[in-house]
């Protein structure tokens, strides 16, 4: 904050004048004063005792008196033991608000052509089923993180790797071929991803029937699966796909295209997008090539059965399979290939993978392998590891068809938001189109905020009922406060009030108003911290705290009814800047805020 920098400079000058010692800004420990004490900023004086050769209280007293004489930003001070509590002058807070008011994008660092380029991968769906609740957390985290990293002055490429090949895809294809009767999204009235997901579940159920029948004849579960004709057919279909069989490839393309159309609808409703999409079917051969290159260079080794491995024991890990004995690739091989293609396509300075914490070991290994293969970005890749998400009813499974689909969840959230908003009268005097738009904004905002306010590294339970509440740490509470501020500003405009670009520095404001200005000013640091920690939760919880503080201010003070015109203008400018920061912060979370509600 500018005020802190100003006072820090004065403290450095004071230490020099009082004690003849040179100190740096990093040695000046200036922090927010605790709520139980009077003041805005507190200086810890203990580091200066060896220079002053006096008691903590006397040293604090001398520095306080120096600041009072020489720094206009300091209005008064008090000393508690070794702590110097400073009260900042009213005029400084108003001046700080003027400065923030001049900056439409306060707290956001502009991106230039010279800015570092960060690629962030998220979503990574399989084309055998719709996106589910786990994907929702992944997409929301990835999209928000891309906005936060961009707000920290980086160029961003949002990317997605679609897992469009493999045995799981062949299971859906085989089920459609055997029992689909030519079903299409058009003939069934279903989204393509849901239709294909149904066939994946159907295959799983048919496989269970077959293996249970074999187990009834005395076979073990493992023996039954090994003798399954369905699994044999699925493996044969995969072999044909890899061999480029025209019929299998045509079926694969048709069914995948149905899925992509469905995914696009889901992404659009969720409000996330991508700059570049990669497909595993295009990258796995690249990975094989890099592995063979590593084998030739002696980085990897081949076992007697023909499989290729990396020995990572010297790196504190184990041995890692890279190519099976039959020459087929594993996930690690594909990730190596995808990384190569990406760095061929873009001059990437940093690569971030948004993938659940069950893959921690995988990315630890990938980082080492890429480094061994000579990729400069290997050591610096970031695995943004996040926890699992569940509903109150328990975990999600996709094979049994009990998965919580993202589409169903979003539709339910919008429907619930519509009902609650109607009950509370928040849709009164709106056209049906406006009311539906508010239901969408509130429903999706509830979902996004509830997920993003949680520390991403923690497992969480998503509670739909809790998330749609117009009170407490929720999206609707923040959205409603924003709409309330916009309503105040509209009424001011209707009364002919034109907000000044610069407020005079000559009037007194309350402590609560000073606190609000301080909170607004903190936004720039919050954005930096969120980028540093890869945590949208930093932004979410800051916005909630800001809105909570504003609501208390709104309750305690008159705005439009204030008789003093200077104070009225000040409170309107203060309100406008709270709204500006709320909108900016919610945008970093990918959440819309309504102008009226």
From Swiss-Prot:
- Keyword set for this entry? Aminoacyl-tRNA synthetase, ATP-binding, Cytoplasm, Ligase, Nucleotide-binding, Protein biosynthesis
Tell me where in or outside the cell this protein is found: Cytoplasm
Query: What InterPro entries is this protein classified in?
Result: aa-tRNA-synth_I_CS (IPR001412), Arg-tRNA-ligase (IPR001278), Arg-tRNA-synth_N (IPR005148), Arg-tRNA-synth_N_sf (IPR036695), ArgRS_core (IPR035684), DALR_anticod-bd (IPR008909), Rossmann-like_a/b/a_fold (IPR014729), tRNAsynth_Ia_anticodon-bd (IPR009080)
Task: Write the Enzyme Commission number(s) for this entry.
Answer: 6.1.1.19
Question: In terms of one coarse class, where is the protein primarily found?
Answer: cytoplasm
User: Would you identify the family this protein belongs to, as annotated?
Assistant: Belongs to the class-I aminoacyl-tRNA synthetase family.
Subunit architecture: Monomer.
Q: What is this protein called?
A: Arginine--tRNA ligase
């Amino acid at each position: 904050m500018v005020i802190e920098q100003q006072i820090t400079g004065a403290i450095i000058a004071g230490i020099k004048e009082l004690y003849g010692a040179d100190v740096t800004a990093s040695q000046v420990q200036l922090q927010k004063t605790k709520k139980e004490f009077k003041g805005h900023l507190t200086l810890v004086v203990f580091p200066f005792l060896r220079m002053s050769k006096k008691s903590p209280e006397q040293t604090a007293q001398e520095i306080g008196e120096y600041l009072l004489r020489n720094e206009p930003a300091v209005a008064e001070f008090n000393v508690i033991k070794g702590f110097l509590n400073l009260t900042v002058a009213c005029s400084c807070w108003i001046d700080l608000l003027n400065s923030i008011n001049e900056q439409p994008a306060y707290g956001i660092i502009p991106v230039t052509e010279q800015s570092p380029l960060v690629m962030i991968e998220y979503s990574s769906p399989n084309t055998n089923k719709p996106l589910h609740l786990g994907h929702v957390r992944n997409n929301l985290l990835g999209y928000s993180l891309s906005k936060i990293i961009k707000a920290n002055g980086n160029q961003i490429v949002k990317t997605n790797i679609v897992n469009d090949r493999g045995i799981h895809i062949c299971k859906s294809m085989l089920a459609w071929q055997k029992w689909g009767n030519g079903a299409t999204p058009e003939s069934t009235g279903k989204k393509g991803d849901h239709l294909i997901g149904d066939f994946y579940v159907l295959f799983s159920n048919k496989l269970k029937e077959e293996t249970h029948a074999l187990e009834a004849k005395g076979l073990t579960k493992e023996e039954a699966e090994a003798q399954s004709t369905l699994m044999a057919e699925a493996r044969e279909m995969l072999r044909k796909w890899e061999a480029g069989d025209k019929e299998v490839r045509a079926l694969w393309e048709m069914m995948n295209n149905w899925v992509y159309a469905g995914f696009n609808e889901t992404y659009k409703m969720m409000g996330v997008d991508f700059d570049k999409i990669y497909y595993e079917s295009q990258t796995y051969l690249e990975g094989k090539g890099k592995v063979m290159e590593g084998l030739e260079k002696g980085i990897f080794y081949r076992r007697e059965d023909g499989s290729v491995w990396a020995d990572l024991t010297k790196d504190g890990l184990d041995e890692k399979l890279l190519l099976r004995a039959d020459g087929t690739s594993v996930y690690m091989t594909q990730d190596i290939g995808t990384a190569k293609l990406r760095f061929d396509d873009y001059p990437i300075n940093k690569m971030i993978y948004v993938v659940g914490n069950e893959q921690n070991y995988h990315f630890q290994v990938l980082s080492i392998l890429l480094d061994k293969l000579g990729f400069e970005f290997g050591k610096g890749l970031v695995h943004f590891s996040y926890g699992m998400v569940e509903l109150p009813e328990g975990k999600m499974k996709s094979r049994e068809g009990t998965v919580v689909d993202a589409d169903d969840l979003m539709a339910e959230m919008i429907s619930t938001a519509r009902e609650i908003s109607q009950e509370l009268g928040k849709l009164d005097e709106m056209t049906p189109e406006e009311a539906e738009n508010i239901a969408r904004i509130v429903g999706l905002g509830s979902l996004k905020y509830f997920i993003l306010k949680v520390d991403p590294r923690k497992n969480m339970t998503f509670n739909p009922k809790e998330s749609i509440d117009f009170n407490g740490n929720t999206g609707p509470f923040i959205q409603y406060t924003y709409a309330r501020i916009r309503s105040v500003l509209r009424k001011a405009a209707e009364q002919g009030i034109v907000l000044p670009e610069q407020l005079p520095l000559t009037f007194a404001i309350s402590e609560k108003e000073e606190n609000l200005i301080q909170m607004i000013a903190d936004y720039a640091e919050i954005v930096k911290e969120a980028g540093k920690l890869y945590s949208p939760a930093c932004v979410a919880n800051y916005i909630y705290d800001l809105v909570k503080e504003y609501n208390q201010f709104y309750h305690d003070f008159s705005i439009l009814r204030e008789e003093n015109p200077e104070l009225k203008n000040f409170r309107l400018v203060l309100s406008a800047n709270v709204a500006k920061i709320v909108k900016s912060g919610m945008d970093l979370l990918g959440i819309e805020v309504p102008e009226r509600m």
